From Swiss-Prot:
Heterohexamer of two alpha and four beta subunits. SUPFAM superfamilies: Prefoldin. It comes from Sulfolobus acidocaldarius (strain ATCC 33909 / DSM 639 / JCM 8929 / NBRC 15157 / NCIMB 11770). Keywords: Chaperone, Cytoplasm. One of its GO terms (molecular function) is unfolded protein binding. Molecular chaperone capable of stabilizing a range of proteins. Seems to fulfill an ATP-independent, HSP70-like function in archaeal de novo protein folding. GO terms for cellular component: cytoplasm; prefoldin complex. This is Prefoldin subunit beta. It comes from the Archaea. GO terms for biological process: protein folding. Belongs to the prefoldin subunit beta family. Its main location: cytoplasm. Pfam families: Prefoldin_2 (PF01920).
Length: 125
């Protein structure tokens, strides 16, 4: 028994799959951003424990460059702000996509029950 799905249902299933893939991409991107944010926070915590006259080196390309602790903290604070903003943006996208996904899933389920009502629901064997 190989029934073909109605075109409308096929279209909705494709849209559902696209939403799921989009949600997965957003979740993965947010995970990367959150990981970077945790790393920046760790480095900032470590820097705050060091005396202000501590010599700090930063990797720039293939070089280690001596840098001022205050400059590094400022740079990391700026990076932290940007990462937090990006994380919130991804979180908002994720929430929106989850809502759209739930609505699309509900629509697909309604279409499935319309096109394929349960057979033998009232029949007894």
């Amino acid at each position: 028994m190989t029934e073909r799905l109605p075109p409308e249902l096929q279209t909705e299933l494709v849209k559902l799959q696209q939403l799921q893939e989009q949600l997965n991409r957003v979740i993965a991107e947010r995970s990367v951003i959150d990981s970077q944010l945790r790393e920046v926070n760790k480095v900032l915590d470590e820097l705050k424990q060091l005396p202000s006259d501590t010599i700090i080196y930063k990797i720039v390309g293939n070089l280690l460059v001596k840098v001022n602790k205050d400059n590094v903290e400022k740079e990391l604070d700026d990076q932290k702000t940007i990462l937090e903003l990006r994380s919130r943006t991804y979180q908002n996208q994720e929430t929106k996509l989850r809502t759209q996904l739930e609505e699309k899933q509900k629509k697909v389920n309604e279409m499935l029950s319309k096109y394929y009502p349960q057979r033998g629901a009232g029949a007894k064997a």
